[in-house]
């Protein structure tokens, strides 16, 4: 099975300026992510960036780079530009790996590609089982619901499903359902679908929840969810995250 990994690497970050270039154990963060994608067995790994400093750094460690606009509203829009510019075939499997995930396990990068390859859908993703009630009620931990065939029913920052008879007590609410899933923000797409996705108008649901994947569900597309073989560690969003990752990789 062939698949291409595209790593969006945006220069501007309100909390961590120049984030993809920040040093971790002697390498820029983006290089760690690129190496993980290479280890996953991808046929091709492309770094998509909007800044010449990231382009130069990535080329220096041997990466293929595609320069993109700095006006995109989402990572998916950046993917679509890469697919168009690089003339990637519509049936190619594209895996979107975030540029701030230096600890992403290579096994889940290949897993999400294999998940899409097996399913007759245009989009696939992964989830893990929720393990604490704190995660359940944390809006930054996105919850996922799937049907008996693993097809997504909904994604939300709210605690879903709602345990009606137990919800007054958070502990009981967590115990009442063993079906709580936390979504992992890694996706595989058919390349042609990415172009279709960005052609659709944004929807009220995705804007309300601030979850891009809800656009696909709104327009009637199916998303297959599989349990991840390995739970990834948290990506780098803050200075505290950066210091923790530096300690891990020291």
Curated annotation (Swiss-Prot):
<protein>
    <recommendedName>
        <fullName>3-deoxy-manno-octulosonate cytidylyltransferase 1</fullName>
        <ecNumber>2.7.7.38</ecNumber>
    </recommendedName>
</protein>
<dbReference type="GO" id="GO:0033468">
    <property type="term" value="P:CMP-keto-3-deoxy-D-manno-octulosonic acid biosynthetic process"/>
</dbReference>
<dbReference type="InterPro" id="IPR029044">
    <property type="entry name" value="Nucleotide-diphossugar_trans"/>
</dbReference>
<dbReference type="GO" id="GO:0005829">
    <property type="term" value="C:cytosol"/>
</dbReference>
<keyword id="KW-0548">Nucleotidyltransferase</keyword>
<comment type="function">
    <text>Activates KDO (a required 8-carbon sugar) for incorporation into bacterial lipopolysaccharide in Gram-negative bacteria.</text>
</comment>
<dbReference type="Pfam" id="PF02348">
    <property type="entry name" value="CTP_transf_3"/>
</dbReference>
<dbReference type="GO" id="GO:0008690">
    <property type="term" value="F:3-deoxy-manno-octulosonate cytidylyltransferase activity"/>
</dbReference>
<comment type="pathway">
    <text>Bacterial outer membrane biogenesis; lipopolysaccharide biosynthesis.</text>
</comment>
<keyword id="KW-0808">Transferase</keyword>
<comment type="similarity">
    <text>Belongs to the KdsB family.</text>
</comment>
<keyword id="KW-0448">Lipopolysaccharide biosynthesis</keyword>
<dbReference type="InterPro" id="IPR003329">
    <property type="entry name" value="Cytidylyl_trans"/>
</dbReference>
<dbReference type="GO" id="GO:0009103">
    <property type="term" value="P:lipopolysaccharide biosynthetic process"/>
</dbReference>
<comment type="pathway">
    <text>Nucleotide-sugar biosynthesis; CMP-3-deoxy-D-manno-octulosonate biosynthesis; CMP-3-deoxy-D-manno-octulosonate from 3-deoxy-D-manno-octulosonate and CTP: step 1/1.</text>
</comment>
<dbReference type="InterPro" id="IPR004528">
    <property type="entry name" value="KdsB"/>
</dbReference>
<keyword id="KW-0963">Cytoplasm</keyword>
